[in-house]
Swiss-Prot record:
Protein's name according to its UniProt entry: Photosystem II D2 protein
Entry binding sites for a plastoquinone: 215, 262
Residues that bear N-acetylthreonine: 2
Entry binding sites for pheophytin a: 130, 143
Organism: Triticum aestivum (Wheat)
Length: 353
């Protein structure tokens, strides 16, 4: 018999294995490889928003006050886009515009590009986080795939649209009232509400809200009664082995209400995923079209008839006049450097005037 003395040589982990072990360790807040992208980018994006809305003026870019320091509140403060003259410059702090001067960089709108780019990568990092965790616990990746909808909307609105226009100036500023103004701009300059992709987006988002309400109410209505009494808050103590609610009862109820009903839970939940995500993707595609100045529906025959016949008017022709008014007012206000002057006689007037 042979006895070997000594230690078994330990395999040395390389740097990748060491990092992988630390990053994917089970802890209260999972980090993961995706966290290397998510956490720094989210930190910088949120920090940029808080810094900009607290201290930074938009006087040099838009001629408005936009910070708490200047008297704005939560709804009116914003991190505003750079001036139109800066076009698509990345506005790096060390670039030729700011030349390392932080105050100058803020005045030029550098915080907006900082927040927009870090925000986009933070959202992508969050989607990768869902992929990574799903793989770790052996789930399918539908959460991550669904989150591509909000990412598509953010990237199309904040990055692709202004890239198709003359500069970052025409993107939305990061603020509540600023976003509302951007929506009015979209309506006036692109007739966005009559765009079929916007219609599909509205149908998707509102349809998803309806499906969510119906589904939640139906599950609550058909909870199985058990020995402890059926109540909503047993959800926080999920010890039962059997089904939580009766799909058969729910199917019978909605069959009587509508004549048709979901009979398969997988199809039902896929449909609840499909409706909002498809709506968001359609909206994003529509905004990419607007970046290229593609037009919405035009009912030219109604416009011609309204111009010829003072007694003929439709809600469409009234909206077209409204859009002209928005353009006339917003162009002069938002682009003072263009010196746009509209004489009274060219401003839109309804047939009644």
């Amino acid at each position: 018999m042979t006895i070997a003395l000594g230690r078994i040589p330990k395999e040395e982990n390389d740097l990748f294995d060491t990092m992988d072990d630390w990053l994917r360790r089970d802890r209260f807040v999972f980090v993961g490889w995706s966290g290397l992208l998510l956490f720094p980018c989210a930190y910088f994006a949120l920090g940029g928003v808080f810094t900009g809305t607290t201290f930074v003026t938009s006087w040099y870019t838009h001629g408005v006050a936009s910070s708490y320091l200047e008297g704005c509140n939560f709804l009116t403060a914003a991190v505003s886009t750079p001036a139109n003259s800066l076009a698509h410059s990345l506005l790096l702090l060390w670039g030729p515009e700011a030349q390392g001067d932080f105050t100058r960089w803020c005045q030029l709108g550098g915080l907006w590009t900082f927040v927009a780019l870090h925000g986009a990568f933070a959202l992508i990092g969050f989607m990768l986080r869902q992929f990574e965790l799903a793989r770790s616990v052996q789930l399918r990746p539908y959460n991550a795939i669904s989150f591509s909808g909000p990412i598509a909307v953010f990237v199309s609105v904040f990055l692709i649209y202004p890239l198709g226009q003359s500069g970052w100036f025409f993107a939305p500023s990061f603020g509540v009232a600023a976003i509302f103004r951007f929506i009015l701009f979209f309506q006036g300059f692109h007739n966005w509400t009559l765009n079929p992709f916007h219609m599909m987006g509205v149908a998707g988002v509102l349809g998803a809200a309806l499906l969510c309400a119906i589904h939640g109410a139906t599950v609550e209505n058909t909870l199985f009664e058990d020995g402890d009494g059926a109540n909503t808050f047993r959800a926080f103590n999920p010890t039962q082995a059997e089904e939580t609610y009766s799909m058969v009862t729910a199917n019978r109820f909605w069959s009587q209400i509508f004549g048709v009903a979901f009979s398969n839970k997988r199809w039902l939940h896929f449909f609840m995923l499909f409706v909002p995500v498809t709506g968001l993707w359609m909206s994003a595609i529509g905004v990419v079209g607007l970046a290229l100045n593609l037009r919405a529906y035009d009912f030219v025959s109604q416009e011609i008839r309204a111009a010829e016949d003072p007694e003929f008017e439709t809600f469409y022709t009234k909206n077209i006049l409204l859009n002209e008014g928005i353009r006339a007012w917003m162009a002069a206000q938002d682009q003072p450097h263009e010196n746009l002057i509209f004489p009274e006689e060219v401003l839109p007037r309804g047939n009644a005037l």
